[in-house]
A protein has these predicted regions:
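Short, flexible active-site-proximal loops enriched in glycine and acidic residues
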Residues: 155-161
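Secondary-structure transition into beta-strands, especially the periplasmic turns and strand N-termini
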Residues: 4-9, 125-141, 246-254
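An aromatic- and glycine-enriched ligand-binding surface/loop that stacks and positions planar moieties
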Residues: 20-83, 162, 185, 193-200, ...
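Conserved, well-structured interaction surfaces
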Residues: 44-48, 52-58, 81-155, 174-186, ...
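Short helix/strand-bridging catalytic loops that position acidic/His residues to coordinate divalent metals
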Residues: 169-176, 207, 236-240
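Solvent-exposed loop/turn segments at secondary-structure junctions
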Residues: 158, 166-168, 288-290
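Short linear capping/connector segments at secondary-structure termini
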Residues: 29-32, 97, 163-171
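Bacterial Sec-dependent N-terminal signal peptides
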Residues: 1-29
Length: 331
């Protein structure tokens, strides 16, 4: 009896060892090309990760009113905006490469462009429908072009990687070089034109898709690009600046011909709490009362003794403001 029991025990042990040898463990805490981008939800999640680059990982967002954001770097040196705490060198446009607040946008968005480029290629190979592929690839191309324009406005042509092969299969001798102004502008212009002409993206998004780029977003950035280059050619006495301004005028007419967007009837309504999702806004980064997703604009602009209409004191840092000359120009 003991011998029979031992034989059964040995057989069971061998069976268990044999089964374990054929097991292939499924790892749920690791993302690989084999287990991700296999369905529509994966694609949406990955694209959301690219949109997250607009914000970063802190309350001091890259496109908010934070010091060193795209918004402040583009507006504070102009005569449209002033700041109570900016270094004079910033407001006078005397920037240095050693200044972190000047350089951080470059450090944020050059890698973000690489991220978008790689995802475009991966979505092309994903086992999802063509409609899903076309929509999200179109969005990523417009997002990438938007970032490339803003970087161009701040730093000139930057060494952005737009060839996915250089990212997914890099060689040891690959180096990123700064493109010529013409090459850079042509790429951004073509990406935006395709985002408009392909008609894949809608004129505007609503509902849960509000905050995604659209045809009108591509038009908006293209208009900025043409105005930028028209001003550059006029100031540098190079090229045909009038040609750029004519192109800008046409894009502006195209936006109006969409018959969707319009300016607020009253200038003061721009600041109204009731103006959310109004049709003056072409592209928005929605804010929510949760960490990282908030909007600290009010705190930046309100005076320190400000109280709401209900008499409640609100946080005010007395920082950014618009000169009275600008405000009065809207009367």
């Amino acid at each position: 009896m003991k011998t029979k029991f031992k034989h059964i025990l040995v057989i069971l042990c061998l069976s268990m060892i044999s089964c374990e040898g054929n097991l292939e463990p499924e790892l749920f805490d690791q993302i690989t090309p084999e287990n991700f981008l296999t369905n529509e939800d994966d694609v949406k999640t990955a694209v959301t990760g690219v949109y997250a680059e607009f914000r970063g990982i802190s309350e001091w967002g890259r496109y908010k009113t934070s010091w060193g954001s795209v918004m402040t770097l583009q507006e504070v040196p102009t005569d449209l905006w002033a700041a109570n705490w900016f270094y004079k060198a910033h407001t006078d446009f005397m920037w240095k490469a050693t200044d972190y607040f000047v350089c951080e946008i470059f450090e944020f968005f050059v890698p973000a462009i690489t991220k978008a480029t790689a995802l475009i290629a991966r979505i092309q190979d994903a086992p999802v429908s063509d409609d899903i592929k076309n929509r999200y690839i179109a969005e990523l191309r417009v997002v990438r072009a938007l970032w490339m324009y803003d970087l161009f406005d701040l730093y000139g042509p930057v060494p952005a990687i737009t060839d996915p092969e250089k990212i997914l299969n890099p060689t040891q001798d690959f180096t990123v070089t700064r493109p010529s102004r013409e090459e850079y502008i042509t790429f951004v212009e073509n990406e935006l034109k395709e985002g408009i002409n392909d008609k894949i993206l809608p004129v505007a998004w609503t509902g849960s898709d509000y905050g995604h780029v659209s045809q009108a977003t591509a038009m908006m950035v293209l208009l900025q690009l043409y105005m930028h280059e028209g001003g550059y050619c006029r100031n540098k006495h190079v090229g045909d600046y009038l040609d750029y301004f004519k192109k800008a005028e046409q894009v502006a007419k195209d936006i109006m011909d969409l018959q969707y967007y319009e300016l607020q009837a009253e200038f003061k309504d721009i600041w109204s709490p009731q103006n959310q999702h109004n049709n003056e806004i072409i592209f928005a980064l929605p804010s929510f009362p949760i960490p990282v997703m908030g909007n600290n604009f009010l705190a930046h602009v309100l005076p320190t003794d400000y109280k709401s209409q209900q008499g409640i004191p609100l946080t005010g840092w007395n920082g950014f403001r618009t000169p009275w000359e600008v405000y009065d120009s809207f009367d």
